[in-house]
Amino acid sequence: MIDESRVAGGALSPDGVAADVALAEVRRLRAGDRPTHGGRLFAYVYDPAVPGLDELAAAAHRESAHVNGLDPTAFPSLLAMENALVGAAGRVLGGGPGTTAPDVVGSVTSGGTESLILAVKAARDAHPEITAPRIVVPSSAHAAFAKAAHYLRVALDVVPVSVDTLRPDPAALAAAIRPETVLVACSAPSYAHGVVDPVAEIAAVAADAGVRCHVDACFGGWTLPYLRRLGEPVPAFDFTVPGVTSISVDLHKYAYAPKGVSVLLHRDAALRAPQYFAYADWPGYTMINPVIASTRSGGPIAAAYATLRHLGDAGYLRLAAVTRDAVAGLADAVRAVDGLRLLAEPESTVVCFTATEGGPDLFVLVDELTARGWHTQPQLSYAGLPASVHLTVTASVAPRVAEFGPDLAAAVEAAHAAGPVRLPAELAALVGALTPEALTPDLVVGLAAGLGLGDGGSDAGDGGGDGPGAGPLPERMALVNTLLDAAPPALRERLLVEFVGLLQRPTWGSDD
């Protein structure tokens, strides 16, 4: 829900407010968010349910919040902690002294998207002679690869995945490689379905073509090695695989650090070098940036360092075991309900399911689960793959697994009783005829009003939250998701850009 009346006075008060008042305002705003603890949110946050860990991370963050990563010589504490985080990630992912990848190096970034953008940049800039570079990715690859291609003006060649295995065919990826290809990417695991791509085969075809191979392990790559140690059949995906040149892994996911920390690893320093940006042709300080940002708060880095130190290898092994058992329990709950089926057998920390023929409307089911306190992530249909429900499973879910099965069965029953969502005839006709180019601001406002998104486009007001789309979102999103599901991907993108643009309007505050 969006309730801008809570910030009706604006962020900049005339004379300042007391510290406890400002903090109380933040807490009131946070009360409208999804719950970040308690094991009922299956996306966005990663909660290990370890007592005291939040307090430790917050204290470490506070110690380094105002330290600037712009200059590692001025603040050597950050350099030391970054190097330690890179070393830990490298070890977990098959690199370091005594391995077949002894020269692994890396950088700490703000998140998986930045890591992927930099992996693409390093591959592109390693070949300045290629004037029209390209990258090859499976259709299941994270959308951040498309973002990187867009930002860096690199062509994106997308190879479909099998509707049965949800994985790409290495031969199809090989066929997509051209003389201009600078990078081939794969996932371990994929975000949408939680399956591990055939990394060894993909890395081999990339190596045969003389092309870099990046493994996107941002999502569950930290956990996979621990699952293997627990006896799970995790295929090789890391630096033990010949031909893998870089790997990304998010510490703010299953390393359970607070948000804002990912690691991009390269097999050696020569592969990493094109990632850097340096500039001295101006009268100010000589700029050298290993990552995209220049100024970087040390808070997230210190919090991640403290988290890894506190949990330790044994702690992560224990959390992986707890999560594995939770995944198994949730998968069993899905199997037990008529009308649902697993879209993929769980291989990592994801449960992904869809409806069978005659099953419930998935988007109505998501709303029914939300009404029962379970916050799941709907995924739209795509290229022969059905709409699905995604569950990111963390250790905090384990105590709740027994509650999920009965609630899932009740939600399915309620979704059947409600019946599928039917788009109003005028909306269905509009979506069928609409193209991204034909989407006007007036059409967007009309769609927003018809879908119950905000207030549908009243004129911007005085900051009391009455700008276009500034009102609360609908309690049930099935109609919105149904409309998006009916639209082709290009139209979905444009619609979402416009809808979010309606939500993001400044709060001006009062003139008092």
Language-model regions: role of each:
Residues 79-82, 86, 102-130, 144-148:
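Conserved beta-loop-alpha segment that forms the PLP phosphate-binding cup at the N-terminus of a helix
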Residues 1-79, 83-87, 354-512:
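Non-catalytic terminal extensions of PLP-dependent enzymes
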Residues 74-78, 106-113, 137-139, 344, ...:
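Active-site nucleophile and cofactor-binding loops and adjacent substrate-binding regions
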Residues 172, 196-208, 220-246:
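Active-site pre-lysine segment of PLP-dependent enzymes
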Residues 229-349, 353-356:
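Active-site C-terminal subdomain of aminotransferase-like
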Residues 127-179:
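PLP-dependent aminotransferase-like
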Residues 101-103, 344-350, 382-388:
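Short Gly/Ser/Thr- and Asp/Glu-enriched loop/turn motifs at secondary-structure junctions
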Residues 168-217:
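Active-site phosphate-binding strand-loop segment of PLP-dependent enzymes
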